[in-house]
């Protein structure tokens, strides 16, 4: 949900991001909404959907799919329409923290890291890179390295 808000803000109409999960929450986390608003970002209006919503035959083709949780990365990937380039950009799961202070700090770190990665991603010369090079750059970003 945070990545969707950040990508749609940074992309300024050139990106259309969606949130999905293998076990999506039924509602948007109020703390995440608060932190996005504080950062000047518009949170999505709807909670994340299940990944199968984006792998149905009538789903729009996707160019890129980023997994953010180890759970999602460990699942067998669906057949995405459009044969997107995929990369795992591991993020701390704020749900692993019971304490609100720790959860808040994890969400802040996650927002900052996603923003850094997505800014680097949007500055890649996507049109001039072949698929393997682009895949390599996205994997580097997932490891926390500048592409």
Predicted regions and their residues:
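Generic detector of well-ordered secondary structure
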Residues: 9, 38, 68, 115-116
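Redox-cofactor binding/interface segments in oxidoreductases and associated redox assembly factors
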Residues: 67-68, 88
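Short glycine-rich anion-binding loops that position phosphate/pyrophosphate groups of nucleotides
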Residues: 70-73
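Short, flexible, glycine/charge-rich loop motifs used to bind or transfer phosphoryl groups or to couple energy/partner
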Residues: 52-57, 75-77
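Phosphate-binding/catalytic loops
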Residues: 76-147
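Alpha-helix C-terminal capping/helix-to-coil transition sites in glycosyltransferase folds
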Residues: 60-61
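Conserved active-site segments centered on acidic
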Residues: 1-55
């Amino acid at each position: 949900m945070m990545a969707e808000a950040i990508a749609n803000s940074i992309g300024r109409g050139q990106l259309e991001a969606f949130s999905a999960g293998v076990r999506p929450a039924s509602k948007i986390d109020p703390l995440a909404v608060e932190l996005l608003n504080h950062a000047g970002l518009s949170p999505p209006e709807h909670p994340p959907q299940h990944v199968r919503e984006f792998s149905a035959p009538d789903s729009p083709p996707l160019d890129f799919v980023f997994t953010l949780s180890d759970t999602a990365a460990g699942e067998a990937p669906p057949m995405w329409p459009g044969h997107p380039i995929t990369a795992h950009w591991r993020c701390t799961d704020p749900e692993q923290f019971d304490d609100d202070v720790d959860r808040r700090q994890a969400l802040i770190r996650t927002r900052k890291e996603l923003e850094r990665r997505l800014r680097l991603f949007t500055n890649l010369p996507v049109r001039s890179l072949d698929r393997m090079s682009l895949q390599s750059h996205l994997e580097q970003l997932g490891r926390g390295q500048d592409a």
